[in-house]
Amino acid sequence: SDIAMVLDECVPYPAGPNHARDSMERTVRWARRSIESRRREDQALFAIVQGGTYKELRRECADELVSLPFEGFAVGGLGVGEGEDLLHEVAEFTSGLLPEDRPRYLMGVGRPEDIEFAVQQGYDLFDCVLPTRNARTGSLFTSKGKLSIKRAEFSRDPRPVDESCECYCCRYFSRAYLRHLYVTGEILASTLQTHHNLYFYHRVMGRLRQGIRENRVIYSSANSEQVKESRSY
């Protein structure tokens, strides 16, 4: 692979300060050992900042890791149940501890509104199971909010999942057909719905990249809130 991640220990939420400190210190020791045992020069090595929701531990961990010759830095241990406000607070704080000339990777965080926030804090990389996991359970992202394809109201709906989407799924298949595939247990349902959700995320990231080039955020918070809060669609 082009990038290798060091071993780390991610504590659950909530975790006491002693548990979080032990985990953070173990993560730093593993990071140092990764540098000492490194053999490949053609592979970037990323460290992972841990420390739970404790800012003093995050700062201590970041200071230790930044002093080592890593090509990039990840922030782990978020998106584990701490809630949106605390996630944003710790993500913003930790990003400010990392160098601007190397990639910042926010691990395991993948809601569109969280990605938008994180990009504004300087994060470059993300990973999350959300688009594929939601697709398998019939939950689809659209420009008007989340759509649950399993709902009976879509059984005769000839429209695509999202009329503003140009993905293969939306160009060739109706909501009614997708619902039929889903309720009958056809594997094609997961395939098409995964394609759609990944295409949605591709569009989100494309708009964010365009916004960075133009020094503005195109994927607006209002639309993010719509995606997050919509329950009846």
Model region roles, listed by residue range:
Residues 28, 32, 88, 95, ...:
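Predominant activation on well-ordered alpha-helical scaffold segments within soluble catalytic domains
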